From Swiss-Prot:
One of its GO terms (molecular function) is carbohydrate derivative binding. The lineage of its organism: Bacteria, Pseudomonadati, Pseudomonadota, Gammaproteobacteria, Enterobacterales. Keywords: Hydrolase, Repeat. The keyword Magnesium does not apply. The gene is frlB. Strongly inhibited by ZnCl(2). This is Fructoselysine 6-phosphate deglycase. GO terms for biological process: fructose 6-phosphate metabolic process; protein N-linked glycosylation; UDP-N-acetylglucosamine metabolic process. It catalyses: N(6)-(6-phospho-D-fructosyl)-L-lysine + H2O = D-glucose 6-phosphate + L-lysine.
Length: 340
């Protein structure tokens, strides 16, 4: 196990998470609402979120929210996919919202430039006001925070929640917006109470050479963020992500003793689908971890699961890496260390 002061590890964002979420709720969400006000004035009827990595997964979650509770046309597209296969419809009734923490992601900047050239409303969500991405967008929000999963998810959710509220009010959307007020306290509780369990699960998972992550519903994008982005980039663990409903259509054939699985189990309508996969796997291997939103939700809406489930996964992945004697901040290639 790596001997390290966790307060020095940039990967671990639990320390200031609550304060950052409180700040975004009070200061930055109203700025999102102002952008949505302009979108409504311009009769925007199509939204393209463009991002890469974890920011893309946050945007995908917001896209699923829109699909579930509205007829809004919302898309979440990887940067180069947007640039290489630019949507046929890109005009003055579209919005292109680029999400990039450092604001230097080449393809996201290019996507905003493409959108602006076609007359689309453009906005950028990034950490600093002087990020390069801000010059490519008509509007920008610099959130000044490090817990990017929570922040990006909150900003993208706020776009969708406000658009639905203004254009086609929905009772469930009202419940989600109301429960967001309780998010800081709920996150704080998990930060304080989940470290030891996360350590135990991380130690267990560190013994596995790779992990299959399985999720459904609003947790699908978080499943990718944790099972691919986090495991591969930060813990150097091989990973694969499977959508719960697709598990029986091929992937079930690799289940056997010793094969490791991580399940993210929500309490939305897709719960039974993931439970079916869990039951099948548990009959055939003991290497199973289940993170269950029903146990940590604190009564919050099922579509807030991606916010809360992040905390157990943050602790699990941190300790997984530490038990593998790997500092999650260490890189071999990423961030310009090697030409790509």
């Amino acid at each position: 196990m790596l001997d390290i002061d966790k307060s020095t590890v940039d990967f671990l964002v639990t320390e200031n998470m609550v304060q950052e979420v409180e700040k975004v709720l009070s200061h930055d969400v109203p700025l999102v609402h102002a952008i949505v006000e302009e979108m409504v004035k311009r009769d925007i009827d199509r939204i393209y979120f463009v991002a890469c990595g974890s920011p893309l997964n946050a945007a995908q979650t917001a896209k699923h929210l829109a699909d579930r509770f509205s007829d809004l046309q919302v898309y979440a597209i990887s940067g180069w996919e947007f640039c290489d296969n630019t949507p046929y419809r890109l005009d003055d009734r579209c919005a292109v919202i680029g999400v990039s923490d450092y604001g230097k992601t080449e393809e996201v900047i290019k996507a905003l430039e493409l959108g602006r050239a076609c007359g689309a409303l453009t906005a950028a969500f990034t950490k600093r006001a002087d990020s390069p991405i801000t010059s490519a967008a008509e509007f920008s929000i610099d959130y000044q925070a490090d817990c990017i999963w929570e922040i990006h998810l909150l900003l993208c959710y706020s776009v969708v929640l406000e658009m639905i509220t203004r254009l086609a009010p929905n009772a469930e959307i009202g419940k989600i917006k109301n429960d967001l007020k309780q998010l800081p306290n709920a996150l704080g509780h998990l930060v304080r109470t989940w470290e030891e369990k996360g350590r135990q699960l991380g130690e267990l998972a560190s013994q596995w050479p790779m992990i299959y992550t399985v999720a459904a519903g609003p947790l699908r994008p978080l499943g990718y963020k944790e099972g691919i982005v986090t495991l591969m980039e930060f813990t150097w663990t091989h990973g694969c992500v499977i959508e719960s409903g697709e598990f029986r259509h091929g992937p079930l054939e690799i289940v056997e003793p010793g094969v490791p699985f991580l399940f993210l189990l929500g309490n939305d309508e897709s719960r039974h689908t993931t439970e079916r996969a869990i039951n099948f796997v548990k009959q055939r291997t003991d290497n199973v971890i289940v993170i269950d939103y029903a146990e940590i939700s604190q009564g919050l809406h099922p579509w807030l699961a991606p916010f809360l489930m992040f905390v157990p996964m943050e602790w699990l992945c941190y300790y997984l890496s530490i038990y593998k004697d790997h500092n999650p901040d260490e890189r071999r290639y990423y961030g310009g260390l090697v030409e790509y």
